[in-house]
Amino acid sequence: MSGILRIVATPIGNLEDMTLRALRTLKEADFILCEDTRTTKHLLDHYQIKTSTISYHQHSGELKIDRIIDLLNTGKSLALVTDAGTPGISDPGGKLVSAVREKLGNAIKIESVPGVSALAAAVSLSGVGFDRFLFLGFLPHKKGRQTMLKQILTSEYSVVLYESKHRIVKLLEELSALKFPDGTEVMVARELTKLFESFYFGSPEEILTALQSKESNLKGEFVVLIKK
């Protein structure tokens, strides 16, 4: 009997954004692979889902991947989730999917159970109407960061990236220093789908000033869009 790995999107804030198919998938899976078992437990408890969880995160090594592959080889149904949103986008899910494809090939099925993505939500709310854009995820903290910043400045396409509350002010300081052409529009989305969802529009300098006044109270993840 062949196993199956399903890539399941989960809410990025509002638990009501869970799809019916995702709920059924999590209930029927033999195990749920999750980035942080404590975060996923909150979601599972809300929907009274009793499926056992297995941690899989950025520090999981080959032994953990081998264990997951063994489960698939024995016919188990596994659901992969991230802390929020769609697995494989700026999280370790992609590494696992790649390893499963490499080691098992067509011996098992890999399916997508799509749903919420902070990337898609922010782009749709921007009002820009992005036909093409460059997505950079989270910029590296040190090595390669300056190269990526130059790429943002020189890209012919609009750019979308993620940032945490700990580094959003630093990022905007760096964007301000890049000296974009006059009229360059930036949108920063914060706490998407949550109670305190908010948006900032303007130049990097204008948004930096707005966020600096609230720096001590900044929470959540940020999506930054730079229109070209």
Show which residues each predicted segment covers:
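Short active-site oxyanion
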Residues: 26-32, 107-110, 158-159
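A contiguous loop/helix-start segment that scaffolds small-molecule binding in enzyme catalytic cores
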Residues: 2, 157-228
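Glycine-rich, flexible N-terminal cofactor/catalytic loop recognition
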Residues: 1-59
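Short glycine-rich anion-binding loops that position phosphate/pyrophosphate groups of nucleotides
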Residues: 12-15, 83-87, 165-167, 192
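Class I SAM-dependent methyltransferase SAM-binding "motif I" and its flanking Rossmann-like core
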Residues: 95-155
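Glycine/small-residue-rich loop that forms an oxyanion/phosphate-binding "nest" at active or ligand-binding sites
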Residues: 64-117
